[in-house]
């Protein structure tokens, strides 16, 4: 009978030992005490040290807006901006729209001419020759056949480059091209110095016979008034208003031959507008709220209960 009680007691002890748990007390510097249950006493320190990794918070000091942890660490409570703003704005961005048959107004030539007189019409803004139709890139075009050797042209040119699709050879104008700064046998050039006979130049200082100067100081209305260094034998009957001392001209003529007036048109138009209005007000208030600062725990002692 006693043996049975002994065996039963041993069994209960084994079961109790297997299921037994120890209680550990962890004390921290900030005053926190935590009780944890472990199966082995040696686990108390390990478990308490794991709690150190946890962060605790303390409220901010509203006067200094700082927090001082128990281990001496000081955290600042940053002011939280409160912004109230109302903004209304409407804006339209003007995108330019273009219309027109051509924006680069390149010239094509047609029509005979028998006597080399050049007439011009139309304004030229910078003294560079212009021809028919608005040209946005300064390429000139002229229009209309020329019957008595008078080449007619009209239209503004913004950059003063003139284009001609004809080259005059021995008094007859055939196909050719204009090159800037050089003249090929009675053709039209953008800038040249020399004499011309029955041709048009964008810029010249020399005598002309039946030709018109694209850039000359003064204005031309039938005759040339000033800025020309030599006489002209061909009558200039152009109507051209020149700003900055230059006149616009286009068209070329051939002496005892045929020259083609060039025709071409180009135009572009664009419009754009933008408007925007906005009103807003913002109020910024800096306050130190009673939030909490994070602090690190510091373990003081561990005890097994």
Swiss-Prot record:
<feature type="region of interest" description="Disordered">
    <location>
        <begin position="80"/>
        <end position="281"/>
    </location>
</feature>
<feature type="glycosylation site" description="N-linked (GlcNAc...) asparagine">
    <location>
        <position position="71"/>
    </location>
</feature>
<keyword id="KW-0325">Glycoprotein</keyword>
<feature type="compositionally biased region" description="Low complexity">
    <location>
        <begin position="80"/>
        <end position="256"/>
    </location>
</feature>
<protein>
    <recommendedName>
        <fullName>Uncharacterized protein DDB_G0284671</fullName>
    </recommendedName>
</protein>
<feature type="glycosylation site" description="N-linked (GlcNAc...) asparagine">
    <location>
        <position position="27"/>
    </location>
</feature>
<dbReference type="GO" id="GO:0005576">
    <property type="term" value="C:extracellular region"/>
</dbReference>
<feature type="compositionally biased region" description="Gly residues">
    <location>
        <begin position="257"/>
        <end position="279"/>
    </location>
</feature>
<keyword id="KW-0732">Signal</keyword>
<feature type="signal peptide">
    <location>
        <begin position="1"/>
        <end position="20"/>
    </location>
</feature>
<keyword id="KW-0964">Secreted</keyword>
